[in-house]
Amino acid sequence: MKLDFVLNIDCLIGMQDIPAETIDMILCDLPYGITKNKWDLMIDPTKLWQQYERIIKPNGAILLFGQDKFTAKMMLSNEKLHRYNIIWDKVLKTGFLNAKRMPLREHEDIMVFYKSQPIYNPQMTKGLPSHSKGKAIGASIEEISSNRIYGSYKVVENKSDMKYPTSIWKFPKPHPSTAISSTEKPIELCRYAIRTYTNVGGVVLDNCCGSGSSLIAAKLENRHYIGMDNGFCDNKKSKYYGMSWADVATLRLDGVADWK
């Protein structure tokens, strides 16, 4: 299978050429269908899932960005595969024109879908040592406990200062003064997601890749990539204005050193 390329094509057509069960991760910022922009048209979820479910590996992860009603629609479009959501804290706030009518917006959703347990590499962070669990006098540290969900389990004290990640990922959104696209996602966020749900050498697909941030992230993390997009850069302040997103992504990828 050909790898490490970007196509200027409708993704519903382009994905038909990807062999079944060959993709380790789909990381995509689909159009939400919430603005009046010509490119912001929601892709038919039924047709999208037909391709996604065909090409993703049985233990592959599908991560889709979303917000508000679009998140709800996508979750309900495949309740069987939807597992949980991650909150992306964008740090930069938006929605100032409506600040007196509703809270400023500071987050987006990242929906996680999969068929069976995917690769999961928790990105540990250093923090304060874990405190001891309160115990009755004379009780063993390794006493047997139980709950309604997991049944019986053994309590083992852990004083490590390494912390597991939570469901909130904090990465600054690209500032409007430097962003190529209004919906551009930070490369570091994409790198974090790719490290979490794939191993080195895995294949990452972004079927609405825009300026290619997710593909750059894959290349930086020593993963293969496939990108698709049939739109063009409409940011008049960008040096890429008028270019197809496929060409923009390819140019940006050319500036990233090969890892092979």
Q: Where do the protein language model's features map onto the residues?
A:
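Short, conserved SAM-binding/catalytic segment
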Residues: 1, 243, 247-260
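Core catalytic lobe of class I
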Residues: 2-228, 232-241, 246
